[in-house]
Amino acid sequence: MSNTDKERAIAAALAQIEKSYGKGSVMKLGQRPHVDIEAVSTGSLGLDIALGIGGVPKGRIIEIFGPESSGKTTLTLHLIAEAQKKGGTCAFIDAEHALDPAYAKKLGVNIDELIISQPDTGEQALEIADTLIRSSGIDMIIIDSVAALVPKSEIEGEMGDAQMASQARLMSQALRKLTASINRTNCITVFINQIRMKIGVMFGSPETTTGGNALKFYASVRIDIRRIGSIKDKEEVIGSQTKVKVVKNKVSPPFKTADFDIMYGSGISKEGEIIDLGVKLDIVEKSGSWFSYKNVRIGQGRENVKQYLKEHPQISNEIEKIIREKSSKITNINLDQTEEEND
């Protein structure tokens, strides 16, 4: 078959598919109107940089997992606040029945506009999520958490009844159904997940997430969040040092990490990240315990500098802008080097 005949055959096949399934159901990748992936900020400057596109991608499934009290819900509330700032409508499926509206408000969430549901069963939770996503009016939906999505058969059964893999089957079926709607409506769907220990693992990590393997495959981004230390004011613990690792990323190179402080009552400390990343990228100068910006001393000690940046938002925003610009250039250089190595 000659090239001309091949082109004619492909054109005829494409025309037939479009006739059957509608315009835009099949096309060449270069003909797509939006090749760039849109993103919503996570509320953490370091994590936005680690994700490579400035936040979590729209129209994708995201999994955030980690041990208890590691900051999973805090991170998702920051995500909601950032989406709402852009005019987005968000929904929270609270399967754990544990959302604190007062804390959400402190983190910048407009609770008057947040749609919330506290379902009784896993099936009910996922049906509600499916209906909201299909409506095309929701920009972000949070499901907290996969472990709390208890199948109806388990709730109606007796205590101690063996329910082998019923939750994994439920998740697998739901994700098959949800994934096309999520992509079509450009809705960010975030699943919060817990960690369990596998019994009898001799080599490698014994940790695993709940709900089977389906979510691991369907998720475009998987974020592992851990508490690595405490922040103290004299003897009082006022926050926790947190480390996140992007363990899977389909939109940018994976395995990048970010560190930030979660302050009790106010969430992720943006000022702390600006100081740390500013010093790392030589934007902020550090000499002993003194910090300087543009040869002007802005404070002694990290906590004092954080307070200074809170009181001077224009300087904070200026440093953040430079950090984002510098980081994107570094990412582009790294990507170019990787492509050259592959060639």
Swiss-Prot record:
ATP binds at residues 66-73. It comes from the Bacteria. Keywords: ATP-binding, Cytoplasm, DNA damage, DNA recombination, DNA repair, DNA-binding, Nucleotide-binding, SOS response. It is found in: Cytoplasm. GO terms for cellular component: cytosol. SMART domains: AAA (SM00382). GO terms for biological process: DNA recombination; DNA repair; SOS response. The keyword ATP-binding applies. Its main location: cytoplasm. CDD domains: RecA. PROSITE patterns: RECA_1, RECA_2, RECA_3. Can catalyze the hydrolysis of ATP in the presence of single-stranded DNA, the ATP-dependent uptake of single-stranded DNA by duplex DNA, and the ATP-dependent hybridization of homologous single-stranded DNAs. It interacts with LexA causing its activation and leading to its autocatalytic cleavage. HAMAP family: RecA (MF_00268). Belongs to the RecA family. This is Protein RecA.
